[in-house]
Amino acid sequence: MPFITSVYAREVLDSRGNPTVEVEIVTDSGAFGRTLVPSGASTGEHEAVELRDGDKSRYLGKGVLKAVENVNDIIGPAILGDSVLDQVALDRKLIALDGTKNKGKLGANAILGVSIAAAKAAADLLNLELYQYLGGFNAKQLPVPMMNIINGGAHSDAPIDFQEFMIFPVGAPSFKEAIRWGAEIFHALKAILKKKGLSTAVGDEGGFAPNLASNEDTIDNILEAIKNAGYKAGEEVFIGFDVAASEFFDKAKGKYVFKKSTKEEFTSAELVEYYAGLVQKYPIISIEDGMDENDWDGWKLLTDKLGSKIQLVGDDLFVTNTEYLARGIKTNTANSILVKVNQIGTLTETFDAIEMAKRAGYTAVISHRSGETEDTTIADIAVAANTGQIKTGSASRTDRVAKYNQLMRIEDQLGEDAVYLGKDSFYNLKK
């Protein structure tokens, strides 16, 4: 039977050694679901609230015992006897229990853990894989991996202002081959950095964090790696960035400042022209968070300039929230949304954002967080929702590779039904 008989949360660790919430749900038939909740480093100010204890004597104030307590003492008792097969009703109940717009009372980390664990228990009950339960028989598109091979910005100590430099193996014939291409380019880049006497230590998301001179220097090294690995940049493999511009926007000056490298300052219009120059010079297919999350005028300038040429992904801008996404659609701002389950806090709201994006011709990119775990839920969500793109780090660190391995399992299970669309996944770009 599908009725919840047990809900239990505990405090565990994420990939950065910080506490996070793990939730387990059991039904009366013994069906079981467990999930671990991720955590971000660069967070949008409009995100749902990740509840931390603030007790400096434990984990530097980052403990999550309060969120765990909220699951065990408030949420759990409230949903005992409820069906795991009615995800929408369950998520609505969780939202109502919290009663705040940003889930600040119980914590999005508490609510999300319960939401996903319930879905996993439902899948277990029906003897289905999670992607099959969430997406039905039409869940068959494998996503293009946006592999983050160099980390800068808030994700590393390297003197590079852009937060992530990614490769997109769009020319691969399958997901499995796309991962092979990405891994080979990753190793080619490692060899280049080693030869130049640069660090091959990796950042939070598994990409290298070398002491390169600038954003352009970083791009040049990546293009060299693509070539050395035997692939053609601009045909088989493209590049992209998560700029995370909110991290270097100086509110006092009202300007964007490359604080970590050249110290250059830009107005919104000047930064748009800077990006346009990069797009003209390099095989770029995607830019994420090119403007500050509150700089809607700057975002509009960026979209008008480059929106028909490349993917412009809103992460901090939209925070997986249909309210902000609706504003973007109405004003024709950006053309893609980054989807992070813990930015909004329930599976239902996550799928609502994905569907709204698709209806408007925006792509939806399923994403990890910098503080990850061995949990592979986002891999299943990417296939369940046929999003066509996933951003889950580099070809190193088990917390990142776990998602790629799960996607390769799914592709194997799907067999000849599996679809990898490559560049056609970017349906937001005008042909």
UniProtKB/Swiss-Prot annotation:
SUPFAM superfamilies xref list: Enolase C-terminal domain-like, Enolase N-terminal domain-like
Catalytic activity: (2R)-2-phosphoglycerate = phosphoenolpyruvate + H2O
Primary site of residence: cytoplasm
Subcellular location, record wording: Cytoplasm; Secreted; Cell surface
Active site positions, chain numbering: 205 (proton donor), 340 (proton acceptor)
Pathway where this protein functions: Carbohydrate degradation; glycolysis; pyruvate from D-glyceraldehyde 3-phosphate: step 4/5
Job of this protein: Catalyzes the reversible conversion of 2-phosphoglycerate (2-PG) into phosphoenolpyruvate (PEP). It is essential for the degradation of carbohydrates via glycolysis.
Record-given protein name: Enolase
Chain's gene name: eno
